[in-house]
UniProtKB/Swiss-Prot annotation:
GO terms for molecular function: rRNA binding; structural constituent of ribosome. One of the primary rRNA binding proteins, it binds specifically to the 5'-end of 16S ribosomal RNA. Pfam families: Ribosomal_S17. HAMAP family: Ribosomal_uS17_B (MF_01345_B). This is Small ribosomal subunit protein uS17. NCBIfam families: PRK05610.1, uS17_bact. Belongs to the universal ribosomal protein uS17 family. One of its GO terms (biological process) is translation. Keywords: Ribonucleoprotein, Ribosomal protein, RNA-binding, rRNA-binding.
């Protein structure tokens, strides 16, 4: 089975070793064909507390780590400061 990956933006880093990542999914409406965007918020494991609000990150699915945490940060693609 393939590993699921998503790319999103960190919207909250107030928890210890956990960040909230918003992933935008864009798709055409089945009847009207207008592009619709839906945002899903994932609680993601961040072992070293490296992520900050505004960072663009790649997340991967993992084993359940808590009641609501099933994803882990794979890499920080861009930081809020722009590097």
């Amino acid at each position: 089975m393939a590993v699921k990956e998503r790319v999103g933006t960190v919207v909250s880093d107030k928890m210890e070793k956990t960040v909230v990542v918003a992933v935008e999914n864009r798709f055409p409406h089945p009847i009207y064909k207008k592009t619709v965007s839906r945002t899903t918020r994932y609680k993601v494991h961040d072992e070293d507390n490296r992520c900050q609000v505004g960072d663009r990150v790649r997340i991967t699915e993992t084993r359940p780590l808590s009641r609501s945490k099933r994803w882990a940060v794979a890499e920080i693609m861009t930081t809020k400061s722009g590097s």
